[in-house]
Structures are given as C-alpha cells and as structure tokens.
Curated annotation (Swiss-Prot):
Keyword field contains Transcription: yes
InterPro entries per the UniProt record, alphabetical: Znf_C2H2_sf (IPR036236), Znf_C2H2_type (IPR013087)
PANTHER family: C2H2-TYPE DOMAIN-CONTAINING PROTEIN, KRAB AND ZINC FINGER DOMAIN-CONTAINING
Compartments, as annotated in UniProt: Nucleus
Protein name, per record: Zinc finger protein 518B
Keywords: Chromatin regulator, DNA-binding, Isopeptide bond, Metal-binding, Nucleus, Repeat, Transcription, Transcription regulation, Ubl conjugation, Zinc, Zinc-finger
Encoding gene (name): Znf518b
Taxonomic path: Eukaryota, Metazoa, Chordata, Craniata, Vertebrata
Length: 1077
C-alpha cells in the first residue's frame, strides 16, 4: 500500500508548486545511483532481490529508501532517478515524526511555507576512490554495499530538525553546531576560560594548547567557586577600569569594596583592582569569542591575569550580541590589550540602556608563577593627585591584569592570589594602613617604560607624600619597567616625620623579562636616594655609616609585604644598585625570587599609624605577623654568565624523617653554646628556615653575581658595592599579604674595615643574601637534613673543621631572615658567599680553638673548601663582615686553603673520634683523580684542586649529597672533612658503627670470601631456596668493599655500595676519553 501511495503522489508533488524544492545535491545523485545500481547487480547471486531493488534518496527529506528500480522511472518533468519518499509526497505528515532531537528547547512547530534547507552536500568526497560508497550526509564511507545500505537507512530513522529554521541535520554534531548559531550556547565549555565547542575533544585540545603549558593549568573557574561571596567586587573593580564611568561611582564602589575587605579607610585610594578569579561567575552562557587574539609571551602571564575590563558596546546597540558579530566598543583610552592576551566575552550587561560587554583578557599561557598582578589594562585609575594619576597611566596600559595593590597598608602587598589571606592580614594590621603603598604593577609590557623612578621623580614622590596625608595619596604605581616602585610610607599625622619606604617590594613585579631588560637602567640610582632612605629595594644597600647602621636596625621592622612574584624586579633593582657595575646586565635577565624589604629611614618615629608596639627587631616583628608565604619557586633562567656553572643546585633535597628532630637538636646545641645572640637567633631562625630549603637553592645562582661586585671593593666602599650583596634570595617572597621581610639587608658584606658591622650582626637577623660563591671561598655543605644540596655559608655556627690543624672555616655569616610564623617559607638563607673566614682572624689557631669551644657541641658540617687562583680567593675574602672584631689577614686565609690533603679521610681517625682504629684504617681512603695531567694524586699540594671520586667513609644521603656537591666543583675541592654532626646523623658514634663491626680484625678473611657464595637448599624437585649461612655467627657474614675496605653484614648493601663506587669511578670516563682523542 505504501509503495502504491508513493507512486501516486510522486508526480503530483514534484510537478506542483510545493515549497519543498529539490535538493541541490541532486546533481551528485545521478552518478551515485548509477554506481549503486551497478554494484547491486554484482551481488545478484547473493541477494535475490538485488536485481529488482535499489536504494534511492528522497530529494525532499534526504531519507534513504530501498525501492524497486521501476519506481525510479521518469515521471513528467523528472530526471530519471528523482525520488520523493512517501512521507514527503503526502505532505500531511507532521514534522514531529521527522524530528528526532531530544532538545526540549527546540520547538516542533514550523511554518509550512518555510523550505527545509537541506544540508548542501557538506561532506563532499575529498579523496574519491572508485570502489567505495560515500554517504552524502556524513563522512561515512565503505566498500561494502550492505554496510552502506544499513548506514543510509539509519539516516532515515535519525534526523534532527531545527525548531528555529527547520534545518535538517543527520548527525548530532552537525545539529549542535547549527543550534549554536541560534542560541549562542556551546554544549561544551572550557573550565579555565570561556572557549566553547560542540565536541568535547575540541575542548581537550584547546586546554592542552592554551592552558597546559609545561603541565601548568590555570584553575580559574575552580578558584572562583571558592569565594562566592565576593562576586560583586570584580564588577566594581571592572567599572573602575571603565573610562566613561563617573568618578563618583568609583568612589562609592570603592568604599563598598574597602569595607568588604575591612580595609581601614583610604577611600580615595585606588582600590584593589585585583579582579578575583571569581570573575568567572559573572559569565553567562553567552558565547565567549576571542575578539582579539594575539600570541602571548609566556613570561607575561599572571595567575590572575584574567581580569575583567568593562567597555561600552556601541555598534549592535539593540540586537543581542552573537558569536560571529563584529562589535564596536568604547574602551577607556588607557585600555590596551596586551600582545599576549586574548580578549574574550565574559558577560553582556546593560547599563543606562547601553550594552556593556565584559571582556576578559587572559594570557595564552600560564607559567605557574604567581605574578600577583599585572593590571587589567585600564583598570587602574588614580583617584587623587595628578602626580599619582600620571604615574598610573603609565602603568595602566600594558598588563592584562593591573592590580593596583592599594591596600592602604604600607606594608601590605596584596597578592592577587592571596586575596583572602590579605583580608585577614588587613584585619590585623588595620592600624597601620596609613602608609601609602606605591605599588607598581608590572607594566613592563610597554615601551612606556619611561623610568618613572628617576631620582628626581623619587624625590618628588617623597615630597608629595610628605605633603599630603596618606589618604589623599593615590597609590601611584611607579611605572618604570624596573620594578622599583617607590613606597613611601606616609606618616599618618602631618606632623610626624615622613619615613619613605623606597621599597622594591612595592613594585610588585617586573616579572617579565622584558621589563627587566629595558628598565634595568631605570632602577633608582642608589646615589640619588637620600641617605636617610636606605634603599631597601633589591638587596637594600647596607648602610655603611653608623647612622646607616641605626637605620639598618630599624629596617628590621617589616613594613611591606612583597609579592613573591617580584623576583625579577628585585634583580633589576639590585643590578641598578650595584652601581651600574658591568655585572648587573647579566643579572637582569634572570628570574629571581626576591624578598623586598622596606628599609625605613632612621627618623621613623612610631606613629599612631604604625602598629602599636611593633617591635623593632625582626624577630619580634615576626611574632606579630605570620611568616611570609612563598607562593612558588622559580627556576633560574639559563644565561648567567658570571655564575660558575657548578653552582646551579637542584633544589630537590632528600628529606629524612629525622630532619626536624635533628634541626631542633642542632638549634639547641647552638644556643646552649653561648654563641653571640645574633648567632643564636639565627639558629632559631635556621630551624624554621630548614623547612623550605628548596626554595632558595634555585634562586641563588642569579644573586651570586652581585656579590662578587661588592667584594671587590674591600674598603668601606660606597653603598653600591655593598648593596649587591644584599640580594635576598627571596625565598620569602612574601606573596600574600603577609610579610615583613625583615631586613633584607645582610650585614654580610661589609668590608672588613667596618668593625661596626659587628653590631649589626648581633642585633639584626639579616636576610640571607645569595651571593657569588667565589671559588676560593669556604662553603658549607648542609646535611641533607638541612638541604644537603645547598651550599650555604652560615653564620649560625662558625665552622670549625675538626682537624688537629685547627683549620677553621671561620664563621660564615649566614644571615637567615627570621621566618616568622608558620607560613613563613623557610628562607634557606643562602648566605653570601662566605668569604673565607680566615681572613677574619689575626691568629688563626687561637681563633679556631675559641670557635671550637663555641661550636664543638654544634655539629660541624662538611665543608668543601673551594679554591681557585689564590689571588681570587683573597679578594673574595675581604668583604666579610667580622662577627667578632678580628682583623683580616690574607695570609691566614691562605692557610685555610692550604690544609693538608692528609686531613681528608686519610687522617688518623683517632683525631676525629676515639673509635677503634682498625675500622677506620680499613675504610678511610679517598680515591682521587687528577684534574690536570701534571697534578699529583698521592700527595696533592696545598692548593691543588682534586676531584674526589668516591667518598667511602659512609654510605648515606648526607655523604651522597656531599659527593654531589663536590662533583659540581670538580676542580676546586681542596679538602673534605666529615663533620661530627654528619657522623652523628649517620649514626656512626663511639663504639657503635652502623652496618660495620668493630672486631674487624677478628673476622676471618677466608670465611668472608666463602660467604660470597650463596648456599642453596633444594626444597622441591625444581626449586632451590637460598639459605642464610651461619646466621648464628654474625662476624662471618661480613663483606668487605673492594674499593674502600668498608665492611658490610648485608650482602645486598655491600653490592649496592660497590655499584656506587663503580658509578662514581667511571662517571667521567666518556669525557676523559673524548678529551684524550
């Protein structure tokens, strides 16, 4: 009956004026059906009806039917194979029967007059092969006619008809793609940005391409979920960025914002334009289309780089904004979409009848680094003072996120990432909100780098600040690339003296290298700074004069929080500080985590604004605040020319369960020994410091260069030379709001001349300053318990090498910054390259004894002594702060280097401890390899560099780490002493040797050799079991190391120990052989 109906209506419908026109695909149909018919004839033998039946596609609905060939006969006005299915010919069948889409949103009603715009053959065959069948509705192709038939019949059953325009699609993907044109909603969305797609695999590819550089993802949306309550803030801040919006609105919004954060006041200050990640919340389902796509430089990304900037839409004023629409928007003049950002539609708002698109600017790449802010272009608006506004304009443009961290807190640096911690801190410190924070967003992007900070401008800034009460002060972000933004803390009361913070911290970031590059020169010239204002910027210069010392002490007061991101800037600052020494140039390009300290000047009278009773010393200050939080560790960038290649330590240090316990014991020992107060304080700090050893290790190499500069000028050289030393490794970069960076300044390198330094050392807890480790310097290798990989000179414990020769490394100033608070990241202070302590002492031996008494309890660490040409070591030594007023004698310093090789483990063990000598005589030899062909190995000369291939004294993480360190300084290791602390850590104590036996002499050599053979017991027809031999007689189960003679009870340990020897011994054979060739 169906067939008859189809035949009856075919001619009628096709001849009539029906709106259902023939498909444009029709021309392809002729060839296709001929091919199909030809193929079906081939299969006549297998199918009885193949000769009479064929497959035809309805020209109206594109459904495929199996029909007799005679049905395709030509009707009036028809081409031969034109076929209209029964349903289409009847035209009475409601569209619901065709409509298979489950989308509830799609309506099932359509105008009969509308034509069904069948898909034009979208799936044209690109690589046509004669033997294949190709589906014209999708990408399906097959050589099997049966499969093809099944497939085409499926298309008849499954169809999607658009409720908006009656478009018919045969695949879900195509239907969804079509629906997006009407609804603007993509079925799949990127969780990190507003990218939408019709297939999930597109989202996956997008995420890998855009958000997962180097495995770092940006959890913007998830973060947003964490702080639902603050959703209004970003909008307000966005409005701030909007050029047209009236100023009054800003201020109201600002006050709301501030009250929300319970900031103490400062309504006139620029609010935090830190747009929170929650920005995501506002985004509606409007399709987010990148309006501007530009590739980003990887360095410019900031975690919160996705800021919202509001712009007013001019062109489609009435119609809804659709994905493909060109938009004309009015943006603030300052708004510049940085080259590395995508602008995406976040939201569409209607304000006063005008549509406002909320565009989100986000960097294409996210380096896991938390750059606190890079202002949302345009967001920063100065609410007061022309000067401030001018300064800010410069900053405004470039970064995608512009957070003016205007918390009001002088010290408070608002890390975008740490907003809520910031809030807490602000609550705490509401009282010292007074000082005006100059926060410089990293505006390094533009060439707008006019160095805003010229010395003149600094003075002006200071002047302006002193004039206006802090409230009036806009936070003028200083725009030079050089991230040095000036922080002037303005005394709250007009009468109070103004303490200017020249603080690099304020600058929160010049993370991008670019900024560093161009602005390195723009850093404040140290000379220009008023003497009162110690430039605490990068390394704050060490004040050398007495007054400076006082200032220094005051500096300890932690005023500004630094965002950890500012690594680069400080570097730049510092480089400037260095006095434009040539070295600086290299520094600038390096990324560097940096702690900025705000140096305060002496006149800082405690003002009501300041925290009442805030202690001057950094230690007490620490009590008040939670410790700095290090948001991340940045890897060193490659090109440091001045750093010896060996110095790049990897920060992964093996952790041992006993580390914490050991740290406590050590601290107690140090304190109990009655060391100078500063030392004890440092040791206490060290405790906390040990916890984050990793952070510093990476930062150091960069800083290192600076140090060398200062050393060269031994005298009370002008600040610049000293300044570089001060480069804090910033382990601390305190990202969140929180931290004082107690003083960064490390008294360390004050030339020996200044005896005064001494005071400073005792009084202040200096911040560790990573410095160039001169090859001749004595460095401490910390045990793994405290970061074995990191070489630090520490002032905690004067290093006395326990040799009869009483060589002492001298106290190396290890100026750790006091880590305050649990959060504080351990600053592993990398202390300045310790100059050789020897220089400090007039008479080496007496001093060593004294030190020994002080430190004997304190464990001694392994100290590799590095020597280069003697001259270099000497020069290096000079910069040392003298912890005790000792005159420097270069000759003595040489003596230290000249310690005899015998002291390397060959020294009589009795000298180290009173254990039975037999064990040590067996196991105490170091195998040396000459660095140069003419060097002596058996009896190395005093200053001859030697490469230690194996250190068989002990097999442990401590010694392994020491060996790694030694290996890195291959040509420069003069002496290796295993300290008492290390030995204690190893458990090698009197009469108790780990894994070894004291009665070595009694062990029978033959029996030991026999033990190398395994004894097997046959436990089954095909099974043997290893039988432990003579378990009752442990003395017979001892294995002697073939390399060093060490004895092991466990055969497995003995084997692994031997393998390590082999690895060490053959490590550089390929290099040596290649050199020989």
């Amino acid at each position: 009956m169906k067939d008859i109906g189809e035949q009856l209506y075919t001619t009628q419908v096709n001849g009539g004026p029906s709106s259902l026109t023939m498909s444009p695909k029709q021309p392809n149909r002729a060839t296709r059906t001929e091919r199909q018919e030809a193929q079906t004839l081939l299969y006549q033998g297998s199918e009885a009806e193949a000769a009479t039946m064929t497959i035809a596609t309805c020209v109206q609905c594109k459904s495929v039917h199996k029909i007799p060939t005679q049905d395709l006969r030509k009707g009036p006005g028809q081409s031969q194979d034109t076929y209209v299915c029964f349903k289409c010919s009847l035209r009475a069948v409601p569209t619901q029967l065709h409509f298979v889409n489950n989308n509830a949103g799609a309506a099932h009603v359509r105008n009969e007059t509308e034509t069904i715009s069948s898909p034009v053959n979208k799936f044209k065959v690109r690589n046509f092969k004669p033997g294949k069948y190709y589906c014209d509705k999708c990408r399906f192709s097959t050589k099997d006619p049966l499969q093809y038939r099944k497939h085409t019949l499926q298309h008849e059953e499954i169809r999607f008809i658009c409720s908006h325009c009656s478009y018919i699609s045969y695949t879900k993907g195509e239907f969804q793609r079509h629906l997006v044109k009407h609804t603007g909603i993509f079925p799949y969305r990127c969780e990190y940005c507003d990218y939408g797609a019709i297939r999930n695999d597109y989202i996956v590819k997008h995420r890998r391409r855009v958000h997962e550089r180097a495995g770092a993802k940006r959890p913007f949306k998830t973060v947003a979920k964490l702080e639902p309550k603050r959703t209004s803030i970003p909008k307000q801040s966005m409005e701030l960025s909007k050029g047209p919006s009236p100023r009054a609105a800003f201020q109201n919004k600002l006050s709301d914002q501030l009250s929300r954060f319970s900031l103490h006041a400062n309504k006139d200050k620029t609010h935090n334009l830190m747009l929170l990640p929650e920005l995501k919340k506002y985004q509606k389902d409007v399709v987010c289309i990148p309006n501007k796509v530009t590739l980003s430089e990887p360095r410019e990304v900031s975690l919160l780089g996705n800021k919202n900037v509001e712009v007013e839409v001019l062109s489609p004023s009435k119609e809804p904004v659709h994905p493909g629409m060109p938009l004309t928007v009015m943006a603030p003049s300052e708004l510049v979409v940085p080259t590395n950002c995508l602008a995406q539609l976040m939201d569409v708002k209607v304000v006063n009848g005008a549509q406002q698109l909320v565009l989100k600017l986000f960097p294409l790449e996210e380096n896991a680094r938390l750059e606190t802010s890079r202002g949302d272009g345009g967001t920063s608006e100065c609410l007061s003072t022309e000067k401030g506004s001018g300064g800010q304009k410069k900053m405004l443009s470039p970064e995608a996120s512009r957070s003016l961290a205007v918390e009001g807190n002088a010290g408070d640096f608002v890390g975008l990432d740490r907003l809520h911690s910031l809030v807490q801190k602000q609550l705490k410190n509401v009282k010292w909100v007074k000082s005006c924070n100059f926060f410089m967003p990293n505006s390094g992007v533009h060439s707008q780098q006019e160095s805003f900070l010229g010395s003149d401008t600094i003075k002006e800034l200071q002047k302006s600040h002193s004039l206006c009460p802090p409230r009036a002060l806009p936070s003028a972000a200083i725009k030079s690339h050089s991230p040095a933004s000036v922080q002037n803390s303005v005394p709250y009361g007009p009468g109070a003296t103004v303490s200017h913070f020249l603080s690099k911290a304020a600058v929160a970031f010049a993370d991008d290298r670019r900024g560093a590059r161009s602005n390195s020169q723009q850093l404040l010239p140290l000379a220009s700074l008023p003497s009162k204002v110690p430039f605490s910027g990068e390394k704050g210069l060490l004040p050398i004069g007495e007054s400076d010392l006082e200032a220094r002490n005051r500096i300890s007061r932690p005023e500004t929080l630094v965002s950890s991101d500012r690594k680069l800037e400080d570097k730049q600052m510092e480089s400037k500080a260095v006095g434009n020494t040539g070295q600086v140039s290299s520094v600038q390009n390096k990324e560097y985590l940096h702690i900025n300290i705000t140096g305060e000047d002496k006149p800082r009278s405690q003002q009501p604004g300041d925290q009442p009773g805030q202690p001057k010393t950094s230690e007490t200050a620490g009590a008040t605040f939670e410790g700095p939080i290090i948001s991340s560790v940045f890897s060193l960038s490659s090109g440091s020319e001045n750093v010896p290649e060996a110095i790049k330590w990897n920060s992964s240090t093996t952790k041992i369960k006993s580390i914490e316990l050991l740290r406590r014991k050590i601290a107690q020992l140090i304190e109990s020994c009655g060391k100078p107060s500063s030392l004890s304080a440092n040791s206490a700090q060290r405790r906390s410091i040990g916890q984050a050893p990793k952070l510093t290790s990476k930062a150091t190499p960069k800083a290192i260069q600076e140090m060398s500069v200062s050393l060269t000028g031994p005298g009370p050289t002008p600040g610049p030379s000293v300044g570089p030393l001060q480069k804090p490794p910033n382990e601390d970069s305190i990202t969140g709001s929180r931290q004082l960076v107690p003083q960064q300044v490390c008294p360390q390198f004050i030339s020996a001349n200044d005896g005064k330094m001494e005071n400073r050392v005792t009084r202040k807890t200096p911040v560790a300053t990573p410095v160039l480790i001169p090859k001749g310097a004595v460095l401490r290798v910390l045990n793994s318990s405290e970061d074995a990989h990191i070489i630090e000179a520490t002032c905690d414990t004067p290093v006395s090498i326990p040799c009869s020769e009483a060589q002492l490394a001298g106290t190396l100033p290890f100026c750790p910054m006091k880590q305050t608070g649990s959060g504080s990241q351990p600053l592993t202070c990398r202390s300045g390259p310790a100059d050789m302590s020897p220089g400090l002492e007039t008479s080496l031996r007496p001093k060593s004894r004294k030190e020994d008494t002080i430190c004997s309890a304190t464990a001694k660490k392994m100290v590799p002594v590095y020597s280069t040409a003697p001259g270099s070591s000497d020069s290096i030594r000079q910069g040392r702060p003298v912890s005790r007023n000792l005159t420097v004698s270069k000759n003595k310093t040489k003596q230290v280097n000249s310690t005899k090789k015998k002291n390397k483990m060959q020294a009589n063990p009795g000298r180290y401890f009173k254990d039975p000598p037999s064990f040590f005589q067996v196991a105490r030899q170091l195998r040396l390899i000459a660095a140069k062909p003419d060097q002596l190995i058996k009896c190395p000369r005093r200053n001859q560099p030697v490469i230690v291939l194996n250190h068989p004294d002990v097999d442990s993480p401590e010694v392994t780490n020491v060996m790694k360190v030694i290996n890195k300084y291959k040509g420069n290791v003069l002496k290796v002493v295993l300290s008492e602390r290390t030995r204690c850590q190893l458990g090698v104590r009197r009469y108790h040797m780990r894994l070894t036996y004291q009665n070595v002499a009694e062990t029978n050599h033959m029996k030991r050799q026999m033990m190398l053979k395994m004894k097997l017991k046959k436990v089954h027809k095909n099974n043997y079991q290893v039988v432990g031999s003579m378990p009752d007689d442990p003395a017979q189960c001892v294995f002697k190391c073939w390399f060093c003679g060490r004895l092991y009870e466990d055969q497995e340990e003995w084997m692994s120990h031997g393998q390590r020897h082999l690895i060490e011994a053959t490590r550089d054979w390929d290099v040596l052989s290649s050199k020989g060739k």
